[in-house]
Amino acid sequence: MIKLTHISKVFQQGSRTITALSDVSLHVPAGQIYGVIGASGAGKSTLIRCANMLERPTSGQVLVDDQDLTTLSEGQLTRARRQIGMIFQHFNLLSSRTVYGNIALPLELDNTSRADIKKRVNELLDLVGLTDKQDAYPANLSGGQKQRVAIARALASNPKVLLCDEATSALDPATTRSILELLKDINRRLGLTILLITHEMDVVKRICDQVAVISEGKLIEKDSVSEVFSHPKTPLAQQFIQSTLHLDIPEDYAKRMSPEPTVDHVPLLKLEFTGKSVDAPLISQAVRRFNIDIGILSSQMDYAGGVKFGVMLAELHGDVQDGLAAIKFLQDHHVKVEVLGYV
């Protein structure tokens, strides 16, 4: 549905040349939710703006529904954009218009009849759960309600594609979850293709089918969400994944933790499980096989792309050599083991 091929974008700022995107290629299949994740300044927003030609690439090809947008005239591009909805971080609603009026605006600009506008707007109000807010103004809405209005407005022309530019970044966690569930529901019910950019792996984890990681304008990793979470290939992908698992070392442990082993201290381990290692009884097997004890301080498990993954903080008690053998056993079974210190 969306094919970006060898996209590069160069900006000139006085005598400076800034390369925002460098030879980026990705394919978003019809009906899928595709996430692009990266840190601030990585080129995410430039990439998504190239997808509907709000930003014209310096080089490369943009195909949406098999139509090459880079070859179109301004008039042709305006018509093509009717098949591409877009929502933004800051909603961009018209403060002088009601919820109904904001959603109706694209249809009015397209000279749709008043009866058809009313029918379509009422359908969209029902879809986004705002039937009781049609006469309200943006100033009287919460952030989540404003984004729901923006989503409804983006869907007014029955687009085949929805672009989401950091659509949940300005929202609190609970509201973020509700907006993500709405996007997932819209994708499922309408078969809508969604390309979203974000700096939060939690967003990717919750709703995306595939993910690409962008850094300094280059696409450094892309695959299904389950594959990236199970077998991240780049340090940046690993960093984003770790950010979704929030396990802190207890304060009393942190105070007494030593970076070097001593006689009366034991290793404090961070264990990361992905894929099949999550369900396997590896801890109990290691305890029995190597005559050690493992004291679990805390653990967390989650899902991404249908695959379970988890993290655990644990103390390792026993003979040093037995402990090293146990660590190797866990590593051989695809558990990432990190010695955080000695407590």
From Swiss-Prot:
It catalyses: L-methionine(out) + ATP + H2O = L-methionine(in) + ADP + phosphate + H(+); D-methionine(out) + ATP + H2O = D-methionine(in) + ADP + phosphate + H(+). ATP binds at residues 38-45. The complex is composed of two ATP-binding proteins (MetN), two transmembrane proteins (MetI) and a solute-binding protein (MetQ). Belongs to the ABC transporter superfamily. Methionine importer (TC 3.A.1.24) family. Gene3D superfamilies: 3.30.70.260, P-loop containing nucleotide triphosphate hydrolases. This is Methionine import ATP-binding protein MetN 1. The lineage of its organism: Bacteria, Pseudomonadati, Pseudomonadota, Gammaproteobacteria, Enterobacterales. InterPro entries: AAA+_ATPase, ABC_MetN_proteobac, ABC_transporter-like_ATP-bd, ABC_transporter-like_CS, ACT-like_dom_sf, MetN_ABC, MetN_ABC_transporter-like, NIL_domain. PROSITE patterns: ABC_TRANSPORTER_1, ABC_TRANSPORTER_2, METN. It is a peripheral membrane protein. Pfam families: ABC_tran (PF00005), NIL (PF09383). One of its GO terms (cellular component) is Gram-negative-bacterium-type cell wall. It is found in: Cell inner membrane. Its EC number is 7.4.2.11.
